[in-house]
Amino acid sequence: MNIILYSKDGCPNCVTAKKLLESKGLTYQEFDVGTPDGVVIFQANVSAQHRQLPQIFINNQRVGGLAGLQAALKQIEGS
Protein backbone atom coordinates (compact mmCIF):
# COMPACT_ATOMS: atom_id res chain seq x y z
CA MET A 1 0.00 0.00 0.00
CA ASN A 2 1.38 3.40 -0.99
CA ILE A 3 0.43 6.13 1.52
CA ILE A 4 1.35 9.79 1.13
CA LEU A 5 0.66 12.26 3.93
CA TYR A 6 0.94 16.03 3.59
CA SER A 7 1.35 17.61 7.01
CA LYS A 8 2.68 20.62 8.89
CA ASP A 9 4.14 21.23 12.34
CA GLY A 10 1.53 22.39 14.84
CA CYS A 11 -1.29 20.46 13.15
CA PRO A 12 -2.97 18.23 15.76
CA ASN A 13 -4.85 16.16 13.17
CA CYS A 14 -1.57 15.55 11.33
CA VAL A 15 -0.04 14.14 14.52
CA THR A 16 -3.09 11.94 15.10
CA ALA A 17 -3.02 10.66 11.50
CA LYS A 18 0.66 9.73 11.80
CA LYS A 19 0.06 7.95 15.11
CA LEU A 20 -2.87 6.05 13.60
CA LEU A 21 -0.80 4.88 10.63
CA GLU A 22 2.08 3.89 12.90
CA SER A 23 -0.25 2.00 15.26
CA LYS A 24 -1.41 -0.07 12.29
CA GLY A 25 2.19 -0.75 11.26
CA LEU A 26 1.72 1.15 8.01
CA THR A 27 4.58 3.03 6.40
CA TYR A 28 3.96 6.32 4.67
CA GLN A 29 5.79 9.05 2.83
CA GLU A 30 5.39 12.44 4.48
CA PHE A 31 5.73 15.87 2.92
CA ASP A 32 5.99 18.80 5.33
CA VAL A 33 4.17 21.76 3.79
CA GLY A 34 5.92 23.99 6.30
CA THR A 35 9.03 23.77 4.10
CA PRO A 36 9.51 25.39 0.68
CA ASP A 37 10.00 22.00 -1.03
CA GLY A 38 6.95 20.58 0.72
CA VAL A 39 4.80 23.50 -0.44
CA VAL A 40 5.86 23.00 -4.06
CA ILE A 41 5.08 19.27 -3.93
CA PHE A 42 1.76 19.90 -2.17
CA GLN A 43 0.65 22.52 -4.70
CA ALA A 44 1.66 20.29 -7.61
CA ASN A 45 -0.21 17.23 -6.34
CA VAL A 46 -3.21 18.45 -4.34
CA SER A 47 -6.14 20.35 -5.84
CA ALA A 48 -6.47 23.99 -4.76
CA GLN A 49 -9.87 23.18 -3.22
CA HIS A 50 -8.23 20.74 -0.75
CA ARG A 51 -5.93 22.90 1.32
CA GLN A 52 -6.77 21.71 4.84
CA LEU A 53 -4.24 19.46 6.56
CA PRO A 54 -3.54 16.66 6.71
CA GLN A 55 -4.18 15.54 3.16
CA ILE A 56 -3.76 11.81 2.70
CA PHE A 57 -3.55 9.66 -0.40
CA ILE A 58 -3.69 5.87 -0.47
CA ASN A 59 -2.60 4.21 -3.72
CA ASN A 60 -2.88 7.57 -5.52
CA GLN A 61 -6.49 8.08 -4.35
CA ARG A 62 -7.21 11.07 -2.13
CA VAL A 63 -8.93 9.95 1.07
CA GLY A 64 -8.94 13.45 2.56
CA GLY A 65 -8.00 14.30 6.12
CA LEU A 66 -8.07 12.42 9.39
CA ALA A 67 -11.73 11.35 9.14
CA GLY A 68 -11.16 10.15 5.57
CA LEU A 69 -8.13 8.15 6.69
CA GLN A 70 -10.09 6.53 9.50
CA ALA A 71 -12.90 5.57 7.10
CA ALA A 72 -10.47 4.24 4.47
CA LEU A 73 -8.62 2.10 7.01
CA LYS A 74 -11.89 0.64 8.31
CA GLN A 75 -12.89 -0.22 4.75
CA ILE A 76 -9.50 -1.81 4.02
CA GLU A 77 -9.59 -3.82 7.25
CA GLY A 78 -13.13 -4.99 6.49
CA SER A 79 -12.30 -6.30 3.03
Predicted regions and their residues:
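Local sequence-structure signature of Cys/Sec-based thiol-disulfide redox active-site neighborhoods
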Residues: M1-Q29
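Non-catalytic, surface beta->alpha helical segment in thiol-disulfide oxidoreductase systems
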Residues: I58-S79
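Structural micro-motif
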Residues: V46-I56, L66-A67
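Generic recognition of short, well-ordered alpha-helical segments
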Residues: V15-K19, I41, A67-G68
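Short alpha-helical
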Residues: P12, D37, G64
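Thioredoxin-like thiol-disulfide oxidoreductase module
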Residues: D32-R51
